[in-house]
Amino acid sequence: AFDRLFITSSSKTKLGFPEVNLGIMPGYGGSGRAYGRIGTKAVLDMMVTGRPIGSMDAIKTGLADELVGDADDLDEAMRKWIIGCKGEKPILIQLETVVDATEIVAARDKYLKRLRADHTPAPAAIIDHVENFGHDKSAMSAGEIEVFPNLMVSSASKNLRRVFYLTDAVRRSARGASNIKRLHVVGAG
């Protein structure tokens, strides 16, 4: 865990939890740390959809602490912050970790009604995880140990990881010059 998160203002800077796209959930305590920083609604949206957020949204939600111009400015910003601490242990501001039942119900309605649990078990498992362990950041991080392995060995996760590797292979093979001289499209109507 970090005492302070610095990010660049580049449009390429993205923060998120893409694990759901592989049929798993965040691990290594990430769900608990993020939940403590941004609360139920925001963490569920990020973890269940797998959509990343840009640097400005990360600052607004509290996922990141400080925005710098570009990667070259990171060292100087961190140095200034460390000098400003003067040996004191920094205080990381945490939100109250109280699970809001209405947000859990809203998340189930919003995210799960279009999904088949046997094809994509991770979103439901993530919502259950927040509901069961969200009362305590430490319990939430420890709860990952119960949930993550079951998702990892599921057939849905295995298939989603296979799709990821195949898609990545197609992207890599599509790079470079093409020797195609003529192309016909049949049945494009």
What function would you assign to each model-found segment?
Residues A1-D3, I7, K41-A139, G143-V147, ...:
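Amphipathic alpha-helical segments at domain termini/boundaries
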Residues N21-I24:
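Mobile "lid/hinge" segments at catalytic clefts and subdomain interfaces of large enzymes
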Residues G30-K41:
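Hydrophobic, secondary-structure "cap" segments at the distal end of domains
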Residues P18:
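Basic, glycine-/proline-tolerant helical and adjacent loop/strand elements
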Residues A174-G189:
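Glycine-rich adenosine-cofactor-binding loop
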